[in-house]
Structure formats: C-alpha cells, structure tokens
Curated annotation (Swiss-Prot):
The lineage of its organism: Bacteria, Pseudomonadati, Pseudomonadota, Gammaproteobacteria, Enterobacterales. One of its GO terms (biological process) is regulation of DNA-templated transcription. It comes from Pectobacterium atrosepticum (strain SCRI 1043 / ATCC BAA-672). The gene is ihfB. Pfam families: Bac_DNA_binding. Heterodimer of an alpha and a beta chain. This is Integration host factor subunit beta.
C-alpha cells in the first residue's frame, strides 16, 4: 500500500472528513515520526510495533558497475519491530 492508497482508503472510510484534511493528517503524522527518529528517539505504537534506529558498522562494499571496493561509513538506519498483535494478524498467511 502506498501513501496515496492509504489516504484514499481513510478518506473513503471517513466520508464526513474532506480528503485534503485526511491527506494533511497522514503527511503530518509521517513527518512527526520522521522528526522523532531523526532526533534519535524511539516510537512505540502499542499493538502495532516500534520504530527505532539501528547502527550499521562501517564496511567495505563494492560498486555494482565496476566491482571496485568502496569504503562505506557507519550510519544509523530506521528499523521497525512489529508488535505481537500485528505479528499474529499477519501470520494468517504463514
């Protein structure tokens, strides 16, 4: 599901709220989540999961076109850990 599909679905379920308001709310929520992670804080949504930053150590990679070795710096990357409720709901396909 893309962001625009999410907005469409929410707007369809909440017909009393204009689609533009739904779009602005979704965009603001995602912006707040990104800002929180950028500040190094963790986000926890009970029953859904948690977002945090994980450190990736420096390593030697390869340029896929040339095959040359490239030094990659360490960096923090976003990480999502699903909550038990979400894992259980998703497990119907497993």
């Amino acid at each position: 599901m893309t962001k625009s599909e999410l907005i469409e679905r929410l707007a369809g379920q909440q017909s009393h709220i204009p689609a533009k308001v739904v779009e602005d709310a979704v965009k603001e929520m995602l912006e707040q989540m990104a800002s929180t992670l950028a500040e190094g804080d963790r986000i926890e949504i009970r029953g859904f999961g948690s977002f945090s930053l994980h450190y990736r150590a420096p390593r030697v990679g390869r340029n896929p076109k040339t095959g040359d070795k490239v030094e990659l710096e360490g960096k923090y990357v976003p990480h999502f850990k699903p909550g038990k409720e979400l894992r259980d709901r998703a497990n119907i396909y497993g």
